[in-house]
């Protein structure tokens, strides 16, 4: 059966720590803490990357860009996202739209959402209207509510290319 669409789902979470920049959706946000990770720890772009790869049946971000590989230490997640996009296109798929939710007690995501949308749209060759970003707090509950980390959930619709 030749199904013309696939859905990919991605999730990522990183701890907030002192002494690192906070980068979400390729946007550096002024904040007291940043996300801990092997790369730049961009929780949103990691979830988008996982959703793309998963939807195309290509595994996940760890398979293609392992945190055990020093080549990816401090890597710009936009570079990783574009590389994943190339792999997805080579497999015969193209993203149609991206819907993301960022879970963060702080900082406020709203003032930065348009820049995040623009980055993702540019990296995936999409119209900005095909990328949606929502933000939720955890109402003070759990590790996210205690400001110990930030998480992101992403859904991507893929269509057969060409």
Swiss-Prot record:
Pathway: Isoprenoid biosynthesis; isopentenyl diphosphate biosynthesis via DXP pathway; isopentenyl diphosphate from 1-deoxy-D-xylulose 5-phosphate: step 4/6. One of its GO terms (molecular function) is 2-C-methyl-D-erythritol 2,4-cyclodiphosphate synthase activity. Binds 1 divalent metal cation per subunit. The record marks 38, 137 as: Transition state stabilizer. It is an enzyme of class 4 (lyase). Its EC number is 4.6.1.12. A divalent metal cation binds at residues 12, 14, 46. Disulfide bonds: none annotated. 4-CDP-2-C-methyl-D-erythritol 2-phosphate binds at residues 12-14, 38-39, 60-62, 65-69, 146. SUPFAM superfamilies: IpsF-like (SSF69765). Keywords: Isoprene biosynthesis, Lyase, Metal-binding. GO terms for biological process: isopentenyl diphosphate biosynthetic process, methylerythritol 4-phosphate pathway; terpenoid biosynthetic process. It comes from the Bacteria. InterPro entries: MECDP_synthase, MECDP_synthase_CS, MECDP_synthase_sf. HAMAP family: IspF (MF_00107). Involved in the biosynthesis of isopentenyl diphosphate (IPP) and dimethylallyl diphosphate (DMAPP), two major building blocks of isoprenoid compounds. Catalyzes the conversion of 4-diphosphocytidyl-2-C-methyl-D-erythritol 2-phosphate (CDP-ME2P) to 2-C-methyl-D-erythritol 2,4-cyclodiphosphate (ME-CPP) with a corresponding release of cytidine 5-monophosphate (CMP). Belongs to the IspF family. This is 2-C-methyl-D-erythritol 2,4-cyclodiphosphate synthase. It comes from Bordetella bronchiseptica (strain ATCC BAA-588 / NCTC 13252 / RB50). The lineage of its organism: Bacteria, Pseudomonadati, Pseudomonadota, Betaproteobacteria, Burkholderiales. The gene is ispF.
